[in-house]
C-alpha cells in the first residue's frame, strides 16, 4: 500500500501558492484494508475514505471508462492492481496529473512540471473529450491563473470546441454547471472564464443570452469599448478588482441581456433594454437553479441599473419607488449590492475605469435618509393599516426631498 499526494496540492506547491485542500490517492489497497485501518467510507460512486485523524480524503487508485452522456456517464474501476500512472491518466490537465510520494519526490508522467514552467494548460490524453465538465473546469483554471501568464494549449482548445459542438454540454446537470460557473466567477480574472467559453463555442451552448451580446454595438460616447460583450467582460474585471461578492458578479454578467434583443436597425441605441432583459435573466436563473439571493439581485440590477446611473437626476418620488422596489427597509444589503453592481457597470468602460461615480454615495445616502424615518410617532397618533402606510410613505418622501435639497446645496 502506497499513499501519494495528488492534484492541486502538488500543482500549487510547485507554483509557490498556498495549499488549502489536499487530496490523496492510495495504490495497492482494497476497501476492506482501508476499513480495517480505521478509514471512514464517504464515496458514493467510487471508493473514497476519510482519514481517521485528519479527516482528509483518500481515494483508491481507479480507472474510468466512458459509458454514457454527460459528466456522470462513466464507469469506474478501483482495485489494488490499478497503478498510480493509470490513476493520473484519467485527470484533466497535465498540471493536475502529478503526484508526490511520502519522501516529497514528484511523480510526473505527463509533463506537468514542464507545462507549469511554460504556463500552459494542456490536457493529459484524448479522453479529455469524454467529459463535458472539463470545458468549464479548464476555463475556470484559465481564470485562476491568467495573472501568472497561463494560456490554454491550442490542441486542448480544439478539444473544448469539439465538446461544445457535440451537444454534450447539454447533459450537464444544472447544479454541476452552477457549481463551476459560480467558482469561476470568484476567480481573480472571471472575465477570462467567459472569454474562453466564448472562444471555444461553449458560451453559446450554456448561456446563449450572453453569447448574443458579442458583436452588438453601443453608443461610443457612453461606451468607448463599443462591443456589448467586451463591456460585460470589463465589468467582470472591475468586480474582481473591487472584490465584489458572487451575487454582484452574477448580476453584472447578466445586467445587459436585453441589448442582445435590439434589432440591428436600432443599433447602437438600446431603448428599454432593461425591461426586455428581465425575462432573459429569469430564464438563465432557472436554467442553472441559481440561489435565490443571486437570482433576485440579478433581476433587480437588470431592471434598474440605468436608474442608478441617473440617480442625481431622479425626482424624490421616483427615488422612493426605487428604494421600495428593493425593500430597502428590511433588506438594506441587497440595495447596497445593487449600488455596487451599478458602479461596476459604470467603471467597466474603456478608459473610464477610474472615473468617479458619485451616484453610489448619493443612493446610499438616500437609503439611509428613508430608513431613518421612524414609524413610531405615526403609530402613537393612532394611525394604522392603509392610513399608516400612506403616512409613512409621505414622511419618507419628505425625507428624500430634504435630502435632495441638502445635497443640491453641497
From Swiss-Prot:
<feature type="binding site">
    <location>
        <position position="23"/>
    </location>
    <ligand>
        <name>Mg(2+)</name>
    </ligand>
</feature>
<feature type="domain" description="HD">
    <location>
        <begin position="228"/>
        <end position="329"/>
    </location>
</feature>
<keyword id="KW-0479">Metal-binding</keyword>
<dbReference type="GO" id="GO:0004112">
    <property type="term" value="F:cyclic-nucleotide phosphodiesterase activity"/>
</dbReference>
<feature type="binding site">
    <location>
        <position position="91"/>
    </location>
    <ligand>
        <name>CTP</name>
    </ligand>
</feature>
<dbReference type="GO" id="GO:0042245">
    <property type="term" value="P:RNA repair"/>
</dbReference>
<keyword id="KW-0378">Hydrolase</keyword>
<keyword id="KW-0547">Nucleotide-binding</keyword>
<keyword id="KW-0067">ATP-binding</keyword>
<keyword id="KW-0511">Multifunctional enzyme</keyword>
<dbReference type="InterPro" id="IPR002646">
    <property type="entry name" value="PolA_pol_head_dom"/>
</dbReference>
<comment type="function">
    <text>Catalyzes the addition and repair of the essential 3'-terminal CCA sequence in tRNAs without using a nucleic acid template. Adds these three nucleotides in the order of C, C, and A to the tRNA nucleotide-73, using CTP and ATP as substrates and producing inorganic pyrophosphate. tRNA 3'-terminal CCA addition is required both for tRNA processing and repair. Also involved in tRNA surveillance by mediating tandem CCA addition to generate a CCACCA at the 3' terminus of unstable tRNAs. While stable tRNAs receive only 3'-terminal CCA, unstable tRNAs are marked with CCACCA and rapidly degraded.</text>
</comment>
<feature type="binding site">
    <location>
        <position position="140"/>
    </location>
    <ligand>
        <name>CTP</name>
    </ligand>
</feature>
<keyword id="KW-0819">tRNA processing</keyword>
<feature type="binding site">
    <location>
        <position position="21"/>
    </location>
    <ligand>
        <name>Mg(2+)</name>
    </ligand>
</feature>
<feature type="binding site">
    <location>
        <position position="137"/>
    </location>
    <ligand>
        <name>CTP</name>
    </ligand>
</feature>
<comment type="similarity">
    <text>Belongs to the tRNA nucleotidyltransferase/poly(A) polymerase family. Bacterial CCA-adding enzyme type 1 subfamily.</text>
</comment>
<feature type="binding site">
    <location>
        <position position="91"/>
    </location>
    <ligand>
        <name>ATP</name>
    </ligand>
</feature>
<feature type="binding site">
    <location>
        <position position="137"/>
    </location>
    <ligand>
        <name>ATP</name>
    </ligand>
</feature>
<dbReference type="InterPro" id="IPR006674">
    <property type="entry name" value="HD_domain"/>
</dbReference>
<dbReference type="GO" id="GO:0016791">
    <property type="term" value="F:phosphatase activity"/>
</dbReference>
<keyword id="KW-0808">Transferase</keyword>
<dbReference type="Pfam" id="PF01966">
    <property type="entry name" value="HD"/>
</dbReference>
<dbReference type="InterPro" id="IPR043519">
    <property type="entry name" value="NT_sf"/>
</dbReference>
<protein>
    <recommendedName>
        <fullName>Multifunctional CCA protein</fullName>
        <ecNumber>2.7.7.72</ecNumber>
        <ecNumber>3.1.3.-</ecNumber>
        <ecNumber>3.1.4.-</ecNumber>
    </recommendedName>
</protein>
<dbReference type="InterPro" id="IPR032828">
    <property type="entry name" value="PolyA_RNA-bd"/>
</dbReference>
<dbReference type="GO" id="GO:0000049">
    <property type="term" value="F:tRNA binding"/>
</dbReference>
<feature type="binding site">
    <location>
        <position position="8"/>
    </location>
    <ligand>
        <name>CTP</name>
    </ligand>
</feature>
<dbReference type="GO" id="GO:0001680">
    <property type="term" value="P:tRNA 3'-terminal CCA addition"/>
</dbReference>
<feature type="binding site">
    <location>
        <position position="11"/>
    </location>
    <ligand>
        <name>ATP</name>
    </ligand>
</feature>
<dbReference type="Pfam" id="PF01743">
    <property type="entry name" value="PolyA_pol"/>
</dbReference>
<dbReference type="GO" id="GO:0000287">
    <property type="term" value="F:magnesium ion binding"/>
</dbReference>
<keyword id="KW-0694">RNA-binding</keyword>
<comment type="subunit">
    <text>Monomer. Can also form homodimers and oligomers.</text>
</comment>
<keyword id="KW-0533">Nickel</keyword>
<dbReference type="InterPro" id="IPR003607">
    <property type="entry name" value="HD/PDEase_dom"/>
</dbReference>
<feature type="binding site">
    <location>
        <position position="8"/>
    </location>
    <ligand>
        <name>ATP</name>
    </ligand>
</feature>
<keyword id="KW-0548">Nucleotidyltransferase</keyword>
<dbReference type="Pfam" id="PF12627">
    <property type="entry name" value="PolyA_pol_RNAbd"/>
</dbReference>
<dbReference type="GO" id="GO:0005524">
    <property type="term" value="F:ATP binding"/>
</dbReference>
<keyword id="KW-0692">RNA repair</keyword>
<feature type="binding site">
    <location>
        <position position="11"/>
    </location>
    <ligand>
        <name>CTP</name>
    </ligand>
</feature>
Amino acid at each position: 500500500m502506497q499513499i501519494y499526494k495528488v492534484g492541486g496540492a502538488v500543482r500549487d506547491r510547485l507554483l509557490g501558492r498556498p495549499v488549502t485542500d489536499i487530496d490523496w490517492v492510495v495504490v495497492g489497497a482494497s476497501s476492506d484494508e482501508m476499513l480495517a485501518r480505521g478509514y471512514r467510507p464517504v464515496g458514493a460512486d467510487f471508493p473514497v475514505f476519510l482519514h481517521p485523524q485528519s479527516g482528509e480524503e483518500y481515494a483508491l487508485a481507479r480507472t474510468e471508462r466512458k459509458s454514457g452522456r454527460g459528466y456522470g456517464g462513466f464507469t469506474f474501476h478501483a482495485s489494488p492492481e490499478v497503478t498510480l500512472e493509470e490513476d493520473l491518466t484519467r485527470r484533466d490537465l497535465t498540471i493536475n496529473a502529478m503526484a508526490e510520494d511520502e519522501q516529497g519526490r514528484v511523480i510526473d508522467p505527463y509533463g506537468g512540471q514542464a507545462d507549469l514552467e511554460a504556463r500552459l494548460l494542456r490536457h493529459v490524453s484524448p479522453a479529455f473529450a469524454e467529459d463535458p465538465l472539463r470545458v468549464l473546469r479548464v476555463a475556470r483554471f484559465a481564470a485562476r491563473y491568467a495573472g501568472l501568464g497561463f494560456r490554454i494549449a491550442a490542441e486542448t482548445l480544439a478539444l473544448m470546441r469539439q465538446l461544445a459542438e457535440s451537444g454534450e454540454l447539454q447533459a450537464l446537470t444544472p447544479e454541476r454547471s452552477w457549481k463551476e460557473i459560480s467558482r469561476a466567477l470568484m476567480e481573480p480574472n472571471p472575465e477570462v472564464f467567459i472569454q474562453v467559453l466564448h472562444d471555444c463555442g461553449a458560451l453559446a451552448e450554456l448561456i446563449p443570452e450572453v453569447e448574443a451580446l458579442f458583436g452588438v454595438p453601443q453608443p461610443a460616447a457612453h461606451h468607448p469599448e463599443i462591443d456589448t460583450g467586451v463591456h460585460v467582460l470589463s465589468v467582470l474585471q472591475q468586480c474582481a478588482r473591487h472584490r465584489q461578492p458572487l451575487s454582484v458578479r452574477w448580476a453584472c454578467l447578466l445586467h445587459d441581456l436585453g441589448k442582445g434583443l435590439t434589432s440591428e436597425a436600432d443599433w447602437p441605441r438600446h431603448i428599454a433594454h432593461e425591461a426586455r432583459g428581465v425575462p432573459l435573466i429569469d430564464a438563465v436563473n432557472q436554467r442553472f437553479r441559481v440561489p435565490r439571493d443571486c437570482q433576485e439581485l440579478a433581476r433587480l440590477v437588470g431592471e434598474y441599473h440605468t436608474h442608478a446611473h441617473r440617480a442625481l437626476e431622479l425626482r424624490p418620488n421616483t427615488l422612493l419607488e426605487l428604494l421600495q422596489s428593493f425593500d430597502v427597509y428590511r433588506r438594506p444589503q441587497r440595495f447596497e449590492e445593487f449600488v455596487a453592481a451599478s458602479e461596476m457597470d459604470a467603471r467597466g468602460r474603456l478608459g473610464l475605469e477610474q472615473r468617479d461615480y458619485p451616484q453610489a454615495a448619493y443612493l446610499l445616502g438616500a437609503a439611509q435618509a428613508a430608513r431613518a424615518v421612524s414609524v413610531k410617532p405615526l403609530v402613537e397618533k393612532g394611525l394604522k393599516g392603509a392610513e399608516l402606510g400612506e403616512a409613512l410613505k409621505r414622511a419618507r418622501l419628505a425625507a428624500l426631498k430634504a435630502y435632495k435639497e441638502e445635497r443640491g446645496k453641497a
